[in-house]
Amino acid sequence: MFFSEYYGIDSSVVEHYGAVDISFVCDIPLFIDPMLIFNSEKEEYKKLHEEIIRYFHFLYQKACDGLSNKELKAWFEFNEVPNNWLGYSMSGNKGAALGKQYARFLYKNIRFATNTNNITKSNHIEKIMLLYEGSGKDKISDLTVNLIKGFLCSYTEEFARKYLDKKYIKKFHVEKAYFNYETESFVSKEYELPYITSEKGKKEYVLLTPKDILREDEPAINRKDFLDSYDDVRSMIDNDSLRAYVNNYIAKAILEYEDNQKRNKRSVNERSVKKIEKDAFKELAKEYPELYDYYIKYVENNPEQVSKLAHEECTEELEKFYSNSKILIAKVIDEGYVIQEDIEAREEAKNRLKFFKHIIEECDGYLALYYNGKQIAKEKDLQRLFRFVWYGTSYKVDAEPNNGRGQADFIVSKGMNNQNIIEFKLASNSSLGHVFTQIKIYEA
């Protein structure tokens, strides 16, 4: 069920407004990239970016004075905003909050994040993630959503008043809609927003997000790209002494490797040279954090490339999600499914899997596994499509729950004593055999 379907409007209305037609079955894996806000020519986006940076400077000023746990929680800790239905959640829209650990990471590195060393055009909050090991696209996106929540509320309110029937709109007091610098606290504000009713019967507001600030992959400023772009970063260094030192340090590391290979009568491997260059650059960044700023300057100088790549990522992900899910939904409706509510969760799970297999293999549902002639290679895509065959069920279908033994793909249940685990693996996955070990762990 998509936003447009739920509220009885054509999907083109949402598209023309510039928003994403979100799904109420599961999150769409798209994330806000702050660099797209910074690069935009829209005045409202420019002001939005200024407000984001203003809050980061506020955090830096407070961090300099030292903070109590209460202050750390109030200013540095953020909850996930599930109302935009974007992110990783495979079941509904509830993901993980940024939490205390991320708050302390932010607190510890806020000075690094706000110091440009007079190199870049502006501050960028995603600079903080250059110190973060692993993917940070969901974290920086969630952080940004929290800091622009008021804008997203106004953006959605305007759409709702213009295009939706009043019966779908309700007044909500949205918590932490904006930050009041006089009281130094987040403030609630009332908005008229579309809503859905949760499984627990609670009315929850819905937020639309502009497509032009979203992408599927990592934000333009990210750690992996920083390390991969070491040659481009070196070319950006306008400090002659620093550039000479960086080049000499990397050259010495390569020479040491080549001498070692020569002593051991081994040939020089080009891939090894590249790795040594990258590792040397990584070590240099610890000593000279200005290198991070030269990298950001490099990204700032390529706004067209950033926008083009983000647009391609977003468009492909949406087209894949829309077209493939609609293909599968149509097949499911045409074929029908006999719902049996008096059987065990295990049998119901097996029946739904058989039905899913039948749709894919015998009803041309396999077309939903391809996009532009290319096979979908991600298990996540297959899992999202599997969600659509569970229509009309009274069983609880949780995607990626964690019972303390790691995440299972799905747990189907009706009470504590009537549960079944479902694991997905592509046949091409080298760890296919491991799935049976995983299930035993989950069942323990």
Regions found by a protein language model. Give the residues of each.
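Long, contiguous, compositionally biased segments that the model treats as domain-scale units
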Residues: 1-173, 182
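Anionic group-transfer/hydrolysis microenvironments
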Residues: 35, 411, 425
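Nucleic-acid nuclease catalytic cores
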Residues: 167-168, 386, 444
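The feature marks a conserved, polyanion-engaging helical scaffold used by nucleic-acid processing enzymes
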Residues: 181-392
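Short beta-strand
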Residues: 398-403
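Short beta-strand or tight-loop elements
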Residues: 406-408
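Active-site beta-strand-loop-beta-strand hairpin of nuclease catalytic cores
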Residues: 411-421
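Catalytic cores of nucleic-acid endonucleases
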Residues: 425-444
